[in-house]
């Protein structure tokens, strides 16, 4: 009997330069998980967002105060989220860091030898579900 890999919800995978803290300036691949136990809804800001009017999470407006990524935790946005296995998520992360000078999407850049980081964020990634997804992604990246 073949083991079926569990799928996890995520809102986005992208590559950018770390902009905060000790690792400011380090190229980083990001995976933003979906759902959060905190539900910090806008700190008094009105939420006019109706998810039915959007087809992609990228089209949602960014709030100007409070949690600027409510789409990553509010259940009403679940239909806009991706849902994949850790193996597929690992492939998407590698694809996000591929460039002309790093065509294989390596975390150690083949030319500059600069390390790239992987950051798990959004939706309380260290809760049990996020931990399982993160470990599955690490295992898939090791292959």
Functional labels for PLM-detected ranges:
Residues 2-12, 27, 38-143:
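Conserved Radical SAM active-site core
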Residues 17-23, 39-40:
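Short N-terminal binding/cap micro-motifs at the start of the first secondary-structure element
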Residues 31:
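Residue-level signal for inorganic ion chemistry
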